[in-house]
Amino acid sequence: PGFILIDKVNQMNNNWFCEDIRATNPCGEQPLPPYGSCLLGSVNLTKFVDYPFTDKASFNYEKYRKVVGIFTRMLDNVVEINGLPLAEQRHEITYKRRHGMGILGLGSTLAMLRMPYGSDESVQFTEDVVREMAVEGWRQSLALAEEKGPAPIMEDEFEITPKMMNKCPDLAKDGYKVGDILKGKLLHAKYSRYMQQIGHV
C-alpha cells in the first residue's frame, strides 16, 4: 500500500498547462494523465563500477553518460513503434513523446564501491548519478529535437485560462492575462516549476 501527493505531482508536472495527473502505477515512478503512456527503462549501475570491491573501486561516469545518451535515443525511437492498444494512448505518446529512464542496482553498486548504504558519501553519489542521468538525457533530448523536430505539443498554441493563471502566478507577473495565446514550448520551458530547477543543476 502507498499514497500519492497528487497536488505536488501536478504542481511539478512539465505539462501542467494541458493535463492533470490522475494516477500512478503501483511503484510510483510514472504519474500519468488519462490515457497517458510512458515507456520506461532502467540503467544497471553495477555495470559501470571499475575494480569493484577494492580500494581502487570507482564509477565510470564517462561510460555511464554514453550509455544514458544511447538509451535516451532508444527510448525515443520506441515512442514511434509503441504498439499501444488504444488510439487515445497512441495520440498521447506521440503528441508528448514521453519516456522515462531510471536506475537499478544502487545498493549493489554502493557495496561494489565500498560505500556504506546511507552514508553521506553514498547520498552524494546517488545525487551525482541521478543528476548526470538527467543532464545527459536533457542534452540528448535537445539534439533529438533538432534532428527530428520537437514533440508536437511544443508547437501547439494554448489559450491561458483562469486555472492556468492560478497554477502559475508567474504568467501574471510577466504581463499575460486570461485569453492570451502561448506556445507549448514556452509554457513548458519557462513556466514549468520542474523545468525552472534545471538552472540550479
Give the ranges of each region predicted by the language model.
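Eukaryote-specific, cytoplasm-facing alpha-helical/coiled-coil scaffolding segments in long proteins
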Residues: W16-E19, R98, E132, C168
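Extended amphipathic alpha-helical segments enriched in small hydrophobics
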Residues: R97-P116
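Function-dense linear segments that define catalytic or interfacial modules
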Residues: P1-F3, D7-I93, G105-T109
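Internal maturation/activation junctions in enzymes
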Residues: V67-R90, T94, P116-V201
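Short secondary-structure boundary micro-motifs
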Residues: Y61-E62, G100, T126-E127
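Glycine-centered flexibility motif
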Residues: G41, G100-G105, G149-P150
